[in-house]
Amino acid sequence: MLVEKRSTEIREIVEAAERLLAESAAPRKAARDVKKACEPPHSSCAARNGLGVLARRVACESHESATPLVRVRKFTLRLGAFTSLEDVSFDIAKGKVTALCGPRGCGIAAMLDALGCTLPGARTVDMGGLIELCGHDAYRTLGAERAREKVARVFFGGSFELQSVRNAIAFSIRQRGVHDDAAIAAEINRVLRSLDAERRLGDHLDCAVSSLPALERCLASIARALAKRPLALLVSDPATGLDQVDSFTMSQALQSVARKTECAVVVATSDPRFARICADEGVVFVQGRTVEAGPLPKLNSASADYWTQAFFEGRIV
């Protein structure tokens, strides 16, 4: 009897405890239900996961935008017995104009050849170090031919100047496999807009390139290279033969290309004045070596390096 009585008491205690728990949980459950009903759809778990994915994507895009398009590390170039470049390192960002600058004979022409994968035959060339394009070794992984598809070198003069401006640009467009006349016309307009040259070249599309003034001939050469839709545009001494006004116009055209196409524009120049007005970033070469790299305004006015100061002050040419 005593055991049965004890069991009954325990059962009654358990039932009372369960009732108390249920009564205390009901308000909390009701509050959760009301909160859930009032939440907008985007606060759901799936939406939060979606926001997490978006945040990761933005972070990745930010990282990609900060990653240089071209990385040069400890690059050395020997042409036969002559060492043209030695232990060269710098970065090139997309969407900016980078000036490779220095006195004549400093190695910037050879560096532009190396970046454009247009070096002479392999028997005479000995390379060391790394040129990386889009995260891949331009010579060992991509190969020179594939790398040249991503990089456009601007060549001034030549037989193409016998063609009309329209045909010169259209030739590069057709090389990409575009043959529809309407598509070619639209692409020509895109190229001219990228250069801010709708008026300077757009009014002379049917004129021979050779018949144009010096500035317009240079712009036509750049437009022809730009029609290939390159990731990097390489230009050597674009202000040669131009007066101050035309040099400024050329600098603005190069800035426009970088800004509107996100292309990396690389300019090789021994003219400190043109480097100052055209470039966002600069790399200073002396005797085949890089002595300093960084934002052009800093190199121009706040550098502590002797050779950089001497170049921008015009003391070495």
Mark where each language-model region is.
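The feature captures the beta-strand-to-loop junction immediately N-terminal to the Walker
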Residues: 101-103
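ABC ATPase NBD coupling module
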Residues: 126-127, 135-152, 175, 299-303
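Q-loop/switch helix immediately C-terminal to the Walker
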Residues: 163-176, 187
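Conserved ABC ATPase "signature" region
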Residues: 183-203, 211
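C-terminal boundary and immediately downstream tail of ABC-type ATPase nucleotide-binding domains
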Residues: 193, 298-317
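H-loop/switch region of ABC-family ATPase nucleotide-binding domains
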Residues: 268-270
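Conserved ABC ATPase "signature" C-loop
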Residues: 288-289
